[in-house]
From Swiss-Prot:
The protein's name: Segment polarity protein dishevelled homolog DVL-2
Domain of life from the UniProt record: Eukaryota
DEP domain: residues covered: 424-498
Taxonomic lineage from the root: Eukaryota, Metazoa, Chordata, Craniata, Vertebrata
Any one GO biological process: ciliary basal body organization
Family according to the record: Belongs to the DSH family.
The PDZ domain, residue ranges: 250-335
Complexes and interactors: Can form homomultimers. Interacts with prickle1. Interacts (via the PDZ domain) with ccdc88c/dal and dact1-B/dpr. Interacts (via the DIX domain) with ARP/Axin-related protein and dact1-A/frodo. Interacts with sdc4, possibly via fz7. Interacts directly (via the DEP domain) with efnb1/ephrin-B1. May interact indirectly with the phosphorylated ephrin receptors ephb1 and ephb2 via SH domain-containing adapters.
Compositionally biased residues, Basic and acidic residues: 146-157
Polar residues bias (residue ranges): 202-213
Molecular function GO labels: ephrin receptor binding; identical protein binding; syndecan binding
């Protein structure tokens, strides 16, 4: 004879019951189910399908109504009438109805539900709650929440039916499995609805006295069903007060499938005692690696039922070793670490060099911040760096407009994109990598860089264009392969190139590409070096720092015709010229000659020596030195203005001095414009001559009297004066 299986849930019990009714599934009615069950005074809900809402719980009270059947089975929920009447109003004293008779095939309810633990009502329903707050601990509440877990997931689809099942509205959990979320949602829907109460109920499993006292002050209110919020899905079901701020998980490992646990532990200790044991590394093939939830850096709190909180490291290791050797599953309770590899919370940038302090740049930068003179964004030398130091990243960040992560596009230069990408807060995963047992520090994967470019740089049509952009970064030397491969691959590790000098690309510009093999290398060079032992700035006074330093600069640069009449005199800085293979690391000065062959922009050196460029050694490019005028009203014959045979003159401290005594200044057209006009020579002064007798001191010459063979220098100086916001350099 055909029979139908009926699965029914009784009240709030976790385990469902099964009864077989000797009636075919398509003909079974409510009276057949009642006859087989032998229970009265109950409400019957059945799983049904609604066209609008899908699966619902439908209440059927007509004995002749057919029961909905799914896959040959009927699913039902029974709510005793006594339970619903008891929950409708708070009783004066706790009344527990006698359990109804249970059919023979149904097992008895669990024994843990006695002595008040299984009571589903909040503490506010108990009249003697003040005397029973000690029983309201987190273990009891965790048991309650876990036993209601499965029933609540089934009872949350329909508001009205759910209210009939357990006496109050339930919340739909949207599939979250956390038991603490279940406990939190139960208290929220039955007690409170405000944000303040939500915060209270969120920690109800660990605040025992406070939760009980707050519940006493509130009346039970029925609330409408509302969707849950995602932020309430944290899981600390039985968190103690000492570890409530940590994310604690419990992992059960089946040791029958794996031969070993597969972890190495690290102990932490200091002068105050042991600080616990942590997961050092995880080995492949072990039980922990197969589970995947435990990571290096997690703190081991408990193994099986043995707590490590008040145990020394040696004892904890011994206990762990003994448990591993025993058969059976192993339960590990660990506290998750916050972040095993922080990307830049309190770490210094990797490419931040330690630079020497330049007081001159400090003073000029302070003046720029105070607004004393305008900062031209196009001039990378506004920081008045000396020729002995290069332009650093810190000063460039003040002189150049910053490039942020949100302003990158395909039109941004490669150096700026690489610099933003190399910053610790860029989001690119840069860390130490292992390749062929070789540690590559601060490396990143090619595919990660392509993804970063595609998501952070605007203008790419597809990912292929971002990959082409990454290939250009490799060709430009801004990123480098470990073995210096020139073709880009997304499966390779890369490191950042030298980004410190990427802003000095103007130094690579050249007006004349000379290779140094012809006589052209003797033309268009700097003024000669000073005599050995002589100060390169004999007329400059001692620098005195004044804070804030006054800068009587004009905001508008003077016209070039005014500058063309200036005389720039007395002083040159030794510099090294390099042009690819040609270098001048060994500058030599022939001090016995008086002719000045090398003149630049009307500038004559102090000494009578001629500077020549050596050959054969590599040297770096050095910046040009700007020239100071003679201050203090020096008006006389040129012979009186020479200083080769007399000590330096002493003048009051000048506010225009940007470098320490004896240190040459960097070549900057803006420095020339910042100086006031020099005094005009008296009418009796002799005009400067282009030829100087041997042994005589050099003369100051006007710009117009420069020989025509120095055309490149004159044109460069004209362009620099006509475009004061740009920086023109002749690379020798």
């Amino acid at each position: 004879m055909a029979e139908t299986k009926v699965i029914y849930h009784l009240d709030e019990e976790e385990t469902p019951y099964l009864v077989k009714v000797p009636v075919p599934a398509n003909e079974i009615r409510l009276r057949d189910f009642k006859a087989a069950l032998g229970r009265g005074h109950a409400k019957y809900f059945f799983k049904a399908m609604d066209q609008d809402f899908g699966v619902v719980k439908e209440e059927i009270s007509d004995d002749n109504a057919k029961l909905p059947c799914f896959n040959g089975r009927v699913v039902s929920w029974l709510v005793s009438s006594e339970t619903s009447q008891t929950d409708s109003a708070p009783p004066a004293a706790e009344v527990r109805p006698d359990p109804p008779p249970v059919p023979p095939p149904v097992p008895p309810p669990p024994a843990e539900r006695t002595s008040g633990i299984g009571d589903s009502r909040p503490p506010s329903f108990h009249p003697n709650v003040s005397g029973s707050t000690e029983q309201l601990d987190q273990d009891n509440e965790s048991v309650i929440s876990m036993r209601r877990d499965r029933v609540r997931r089934r009872d949350s689809t329909e508001q009205g039916v759910a209210r009939g099942v357990n006496g109050r509205a339930e919340r739909h959990l949207s599939g979250y499995e956390s038991s603490s979320t279940l406990l939190t949602s139960e208290i929220e829907t039955s007690i409170c609805d405000s944000e303040e109460d939500d915060a209270m109920s969120r920690f109800s499993s660990s605040t025992e006295q406070s939760s009980a006292s707050r519940l006493l002050k509130r009346h039970r209110r029925r609330r409408k069903q509302r969707p849950p919020r995602l932020e309430r899905t944290s899981s600390f079901s039985s968190v103690t007060d000492s570890t409530m701020s940590l994310n604690i998980i419990t992992v059960t490992l089946n040791m029958e499938k794996y031969n070993f646990l597969g972890i190495s532990i690290v102990g932490q200790s200091n002068e105050r005692g042991d600080g616990g044991i942590y997961i050092g590394s995880i080995m492949k093939g072990g039980a922990v690696a197969a589970d995947g939830r435990i990571e290096p850096g997690d703190m081991l709190l408990q193994v099986n039922d043995i707590n490590f909180e008040n145990m020394s490291n040696d004892d904890a290791v011994r206990v762990l070793r003994d448990i591993v050797h025993k058969p059976g599953p192993i339960i590990l309770t660990v506290a998750k670490c916050w972040d095993p590899s922080p990307q830049g919370y309190f770490t210094l940038p990797r490419n931040e060099p330690i630079q020497p302090i330049d007081p001159a740049a400090w003073v000029s930068h302070s003046a720029a911040l105070s607004g004393s003179f305008p900062v031209y964004p196009g001039s990378a030398s506004m920081s008045s760096m000396t020729s002995s130091t290069s332009v650093t990243e810190t000063e460039l960040s003040h002189a150049l407009p910053p490039v942020s992560l949100f302003s990158l596009s395909v039109h941004t230069d490669l150096a700026s994109v690489a610099k933003v990408m190399a910053s610790p807060e860029s989001g690119l995963e840069v860390r130490d990598r292992m390749w062929l047992k070789i540690t590559i520090p601060n490396a990143f994967l090619g595919s990660d860089m392509v993804d970063w470019l595609y998501h952070h740089v605007e203008g790419f049509q597809d990912r292929r264009e971002a990959r082409k952009f990454a290939s250009n970064l490799l060709k430009a030397g801004l990123i480098r392969h470990t073995v210096n491969k020139i073709t880009f691959s997304e499966q390779c590790y890369y490191i950042f190139g030298d980004l410190t000098g990427c802003e000095n690309y103007m130094a690579n510009l050249s007006l004349n590409d000379n290779d140094g093999s012809s006589g052209a290398s003797d033309q268009d060079t700097l003024a000669p070096l000073p005599l050995p032992g002589a100060s390169p700035w004999p007329l400059l006074p001692t620098f005195s720092y004044q804070y804030p330093a006054p800068h009587p600069y004009s905001t508008q640069p003077p016209a070039y015709h005014e500058l063309s009449s200036y005389s720039y005199g007395m002083g040159s800085a030794g510099s090294q010229h390099s042009e690819g293979s040609r270098s001048s690391g060994s500058n030599r000065s022939d001090g016995g000659r008086g002719t000045q062959k090398d003149e630049r922009s009307g500038v004559v050196g102090v000494g009578g020596g001629e500077s020549k460029s050596g050959s054969g050694s590599e040297s770096e490019y050095s910046t040009r030195s700007s020239i100071r005028r003679i201050g203090g009203g020096e008006a006389g014959p040129p012979s009186e203005r020479s200083t080769s045979s007399r000590p330096p003159l002493h003048h009051p401290p000048s506010v225009h001095s940007y470098a320490a005594p004896g240190v040459p200044l960097s070549y900057n057209p803006m420095m020339l414009m910042m100086m006031p006009p020099p005094p005009l020579p008296p009418p009796g002064a002799c005009p400067p001559s282009s030829s100087v007798p041997p042994g005589a001191p050099p003369l100051v010459r006007d710009l117009a009297s420069v020989p025509p063979e120095l055309t490149a220098s004159r044109q460069s100086f004209h362009m620099a004066m006509g475009n004061p916001s740009e920086f023109f350099v002749d690379v020798m």
